[in-house]
A protein has these predicted regions:
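Surface-exposed beta-strand/loop patches in noncatalytic accessory domains
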Residues: 2-12, 35-78, 118, 122
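Exposed aromatic-hydrophobic patches
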Residues: 18-21, 71-72, 81, 437, ...
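Hydrophobic beta-strand segments within beta-rich accessory/binding domains
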Residues: 19-38, 83, 92-97, 104-105
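Extended, low-complexity, turn-rich repeat/linker tracts enriched in Gly/Pro/Ser/Thr and Asp/Glu
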Residues: 36-43, 100-104, 416-420
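Beta-sandwich interaction modules
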Residues: 65-92, 99-101, 448
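Non-catalytic propeptide/linker segments at domain boundaries
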Residues: 87, 95-161
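Charged catalytic cores and adjacent phosphate/nucleic-acid-binding surfaces used
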Residues: 122, 135, 142-156, 222-234, ...
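A metal-dependent hydrolase metal-coordination microenvironment
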Residues: 146-270, 275-288, 294-314, 335
Length: 448
């Protein structure tokens, strides 16, 4: 079985392109090869394949990964983002959703061929789902992560666990393979990692050495937000991909955020003040937001100003009585040897690190303590935060009874990379007022 489909893409091409594929008899596999003139042209869009029962069998931004994609019976032979299982006879659909942001930036006055070759040939691929399959084989039209275990146990220690809530790999537009990204994550001493690809759901992971918490970055022209701890594909995600650059996207984003709240996923607003990617959607209620990304890829050229704005905005929200928690995200898209203009450091998972205190480490407990606000975000240093009152200990985010009480708070900051001659400035919000604390140097760091 062989078929070639060619799409010609320019700025006026509809955002959704679809071609039917008739499979006359069951196959062992479906092999899809993508041919473009330049490697970066694979960033033009998402590939979605639906089977004879209209079930999604793969969803992936073509990006920097392998240009040959395989759907097979088993996870070990199926490309990341795929759903393994039988290749049944009937009418399948090959769908391309164009990534409007890339089209707008690069395709002025040109039309590019986008060629897809489909066959049942056996082909070796490197980027397979791997050891851990999350997607339920008894899937419906939407993807369900029915095999993901939120009770998986990773550590019995009560401590601060370091992780990254905003990451990218070959599953969307990141330049790192999943394997390479995980090596870097271990190098950065991460305890947990959240894959948040642009409008793409991870269907599994290469191994379970580290706690991996499924997420997705809902990506539109009116802002980006992460949904963290998802157990299924958001119902309106296909419409988000199709209408991301149109006024209609507001309705679909509203529905996704309602679904996220109903299913108790974490909603985190990404880089809320970052140039063209700032948050512009005004219909979301502050009570619906769990987290605000206050440090997004600090190595990026425009990061300093936008991150400072995000931190100050979170202070304002706290002063106004809102309980929204600050988290960080590397938002890393690059290889470790690459640098943004003006930076001498790589954009890498774990920079910044977000630390979450958990009594032990499971996905379920991690989600619980993020929602409680037992969090701090850090770069180059760690913190020891001690809060006591009436002989009880508390963590950032914990609630105390609404009574008059004496509260003792001590914060110590440690780090070999703290710049010499620079003293950390520490503020707290107390009774909805921002207060600066006195800081002193110690043998190991600083204390307030």
């Amino acid at each position: 079985m062989e078929k070639t489909v060619t799409f010609y893409i320019n700025r006026t091409t509809p955002a959704k392109l679809e071609e039917e594929l008739v499979i006359c008899k069951p196959l062992k596999r479906l092999t899809i090869s993508v041919d473009v003139e330049k490697e970066e042209h694979t960033l033009m869009g998402y590939l979605v394949v639906r089977d004879e029962k209209n079930r999604i069998r793969i969803q992936k931004m073509l990006g920097y990964g392998e240009r040959t994609i395989v759907i097979a019976r088993h996870a070990k032979n199926t490309t990341i983002g795929g759903v393994p299982g039988p290749i049944g006879a009937g009418t399948w659909k090959i769908v391309i959703y164009l990534f409007a942001e890339y089209i707008e930036q690069t395709l002025e006055g040109v039309s590019l061929p986008f060629r897809i070759q489909i066959s049942d040939r056996k082909t070796e691929i490197q980027e397979t789902i791997g050891k851990c399959l999350w997607v339920d084989r008894h899937y419906r039209e939407q993807l369900w992560l029915g095999y993901y275990n939120k009770s998986s146990f990773y550590s019995s220690r009560g401590r601060w666990y370091k992780g990254d809530f905003h990451t990218h790999t070959h599953l969307s537009d990141g330049k790192e393979s999943v394997s390479s990204a995980m090596r870097k994550a271990r190098m950065m001493d991460l305890d947990f990692y959240v894959p948040t690809e642009h409008n793409i759901i991870p269907t599994g992971w290469e191994d379970d050495y580290m706690l991996i918490l499924p997420g997705v970055e809902i990506t539109t022209k009116i802002g980006h937000c992460n949904l963290i701890g998802i157990d299924k594909m958001p119902e309106r995600l296909p419409e988000i991909m199709e209408y991301a650059d149109t006024p209609e996207v507001e309705e679909y984003l509203y529905e996704i955020l309602r679904e996220a709240k109903k299913r108790e996923w974490i909603i985190s607003i990404n880089h809320p003040f970052l140039t063209i990617w700032k948050w512009k959607y005004g219909e979301v209620g502050l009570d619906d937001i769990t987290c605000l990304e206050i440090i997004n890829d600090p190595t990026y050229t425009d990061a300093r100003e936008s991150n400072d704005q995000a931190i100050r905005y979170l202070d304002f929200l706290w002063e106004d009585g809102h309980r929204i928690w600050g988290i960080g995200g590397s938002d890393s898209h690059n290889l470790i040897e690459e640098r943004y203009k003006g930076s001498d450091k790589p954009s890498i998972a774990g920079d910044p690190g977000t630390y979450v205190f958990c009594p032990s480490l499971t996905p379920e407990l991690l989600l619980k303590h993020v929602k409680q606000g037992n969090i701090y975000v850090s770069r180059f240093c760690t913190a020891d935060v001690r809060i006591t009152s009436q002989s009880k200990s508390f963590f950032p985010g914990d609630r105390m009874e609404d009574v008059e009480r004496k509260i003792m708070m001590e914060i110590e900051i440690f780090g070999n990379e703290l710049e010499e001659g620079i003293t950390p400035v520490i503020w707290i919000v107390q009774n909805e007022k921002r207060i600066k604390l006195t800081t002193e140097k110690t043998k190991k760091g600083y204390r307030a």
